[in-house]
């Protein structure tokens, strides 16, 4: 027995098969697209801390991943027998098949999205919070673009799976490829030739549309991009076009309130107390370095200042006005207004990897509409990049920069919102020794310009040289709060000063 090749090749000229191909592509693409969106909402609900959201989402995923698609198809198609009013649309094989594919694929895609969302570093969300972005803004501009890039290979694979699963819709008489083939070989009994042609059509669809999706994946692959350093001529041109930022200057008027005042700040994680009644005043234009052994509460302290950590009790006053109290008493409107006056630079940089250096700096001002003019925003971003010595790298992505360069971009991003106060969380601890100097130079320049800064650091020489005061924390309390000159005065034999000098290694 041999195959009827003439019949086999004739199947590629049949209009019925090409119409069936259109049906397969249409139902698969719609199911993939709708399932993609619905699956994201299910994944978000499943990850929610609210039980009224995560429990129904978990049940939905569990149920539709457990029930075979064929069972769902037959059930949905026959649902009008229970609810006659649904017959107008569920009685149509295409719609019944689409609904069945969507609810089933939404359950699978929810897990794909969940893995993508979990892969986005926590620091990315914290950076968005520090830039005073809302939850939806962080999701839209930071989390979702990164999660989609991470999940794209698996999502492409799921599209291929849907194309193949669409063959099951033949069970409810949808004239897709398999149904068309079955009708043919039922008449001529050329089963192998017909199914071989059906397989070829499926391979063609998967190859064409899989290639399109893989092209999109390559376009979204940030690490594969390698923009070059701008030429010296281009840098001079951009420098001439740049617009200076409207920097705020410190007010030293008599009777002016402190820039920041912490009153009886307390913070615990379960039974472990991290901050035990911290009190601190910082004048406008003052630079305060916070030092201390690991676990002393330094980082936790500055993270409470911009609500990255909540307070158990106590309050924070910003320029004489209420800012943060414990969870029950903080005013959301006051918090949002105050957050715009505080910037933060993180130990691990937390630049947005899917954006260029220029886009990293432009994003927050554009989000807040400060300025509204996109061209002004871009020119101010060029000014900030020139200020930190990175104008030539404007079009590069964070992965192309050294650690020191990334931290300088992070500082420029913080300055883009013209904050009154900047918090630095160990800005040099993640850097190689030779890169530390370039970051410290930028911070020193800010100090000379009168920027109010709180710097958590292990760079003792730097703390003594740039700070107006050095605060030492230990066991969740401030052990010493003194000017560098007092610390270096070896005639002062008080126990606290001796301990501080020993810790700083200046004896």
Language-model region placement:
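C-terminal boundary and immediately downstream tail of ABC-type ATPase nucleotide-binding domains
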Residues: 224-226, 230-248, 472-475, 479, ...
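Conserved signature/switch motifs of ABC ATPase nucleotide-binding domains
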Residues: 396-399, 417, 449
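Catalytic Walker B motif of ABC-type/P-loop ATPase nucleotide-binding domains
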Residues: 422-425
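H-loop/switch region of ABC-family ATPase nucleotide-binding domains
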Residues: 457-458
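A short, surface-exposed alpha-helical micro-motif characterized by mixed small hydrophobic
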Residues: 463-465
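Transmembrane alpha-helices and adjacent helix-loop boundaries
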Residues: 1-235
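Helix-to-loop junction immediately C-terminal to a conserved catalytic motif
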Residues: 306
């Amino acid at each position: 027995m041999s195959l009827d090749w003439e019949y086999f090749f004739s199947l590629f000229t049949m209009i019925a098969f090409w119409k069936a191909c259109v049906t397969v592509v249409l139902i698969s693409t719609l199911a993939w697209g709708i399932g993609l969106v619905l699956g994201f909402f299910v994944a978000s609900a499943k990850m929610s801390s609210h039980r009224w959201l995560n429990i129904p989402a978990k049940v939905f995923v569990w149920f539709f991943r457990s029930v075979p698609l064929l069972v769902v198809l037959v059930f949905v198609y026959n649902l009008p027998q229970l609810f006659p009013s649904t017959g107008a649309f569920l009685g149509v094989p295409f719609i019944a098949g689409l609904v069945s594919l969507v609810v089933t694929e939404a359950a699978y895609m929810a897990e794909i999205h969940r893995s993508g969302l979990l892969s986005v570093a926590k620091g990315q969300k914290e950076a968005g919070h520090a830039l005073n972005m809302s939850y939806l803004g962080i999701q839209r501009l930071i989390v979702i673009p990164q999660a989609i890039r991470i999940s794209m290979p698996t999502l492409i694979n799921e599209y291929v799976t849907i194309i193949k699963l669409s063959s099951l819709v033949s069970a409810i008489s949808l004239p897709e490829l398999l149904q068309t083939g079955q009708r043919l070989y039922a008449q001529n009994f050329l089963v192998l030739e017909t199914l071989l042609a059906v397989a070829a059509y499926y391979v063609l669809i998967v190859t064409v549309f899989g290639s399109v999706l893989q092209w999109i994946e390559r376009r979204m692959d940030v690490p594969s991009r390698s923009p070059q350093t701008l030429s010296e001529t281009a840098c001079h041109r951009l420098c001439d076009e740049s617009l200076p930022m409207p920097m705020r200057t410190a007010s030293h008027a008599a009777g002016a309130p402190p820039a920041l005042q912490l009153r009886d700040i307390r913070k615990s994680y379960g039974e472990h107390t991290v901050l035990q009644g911290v009190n601190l005043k910082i004048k406008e234009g003052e630079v305060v370095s916070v030092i201390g052994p690991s676990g002393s509460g330094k980082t936790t302290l500055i993270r409470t200042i911009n609500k990255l950590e909540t307070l158990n009790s106590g309050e924070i006053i910003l320029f004489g006005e209420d800012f943060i109290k414990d969870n029950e008493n903080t005013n959301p409107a006051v918090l949002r207004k105050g957050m715009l006056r505080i910037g933060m630079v993180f130990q691990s940089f937390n630049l947005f990897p899917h954006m260029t250096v220029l886009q990293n700096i432009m994003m927050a001002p554009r989000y807040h509409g400060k300025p509204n003019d996109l061209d002004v925003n871009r020119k101010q971003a060029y000014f900030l990049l020139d200020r930190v010595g990175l104008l030539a790298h404007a079009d590069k992505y964070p992965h192309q920069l050294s650690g020191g360069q990334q931290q300088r971009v992070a500082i420029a991003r913080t300055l883009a919102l013209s904050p009154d106060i900047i918090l630095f969380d160990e800005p040099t601890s993640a850097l190689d020794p030779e890169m530390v100097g370039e970051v410290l130079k930028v911070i020193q320049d800010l100090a000379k310009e009168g920027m109010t800064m709180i710097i958590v650091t292990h760079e003792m020489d730097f703390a003594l040289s740039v700070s107006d005061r050095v605060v030492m924390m230990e066991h969740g309390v401030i052990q010493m709060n003194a000017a560098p000159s007092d610390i270096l005065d070896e005639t002062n034999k008080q126990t606290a000063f001796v301990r501080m000098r020993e810790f700083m290694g200046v004896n």
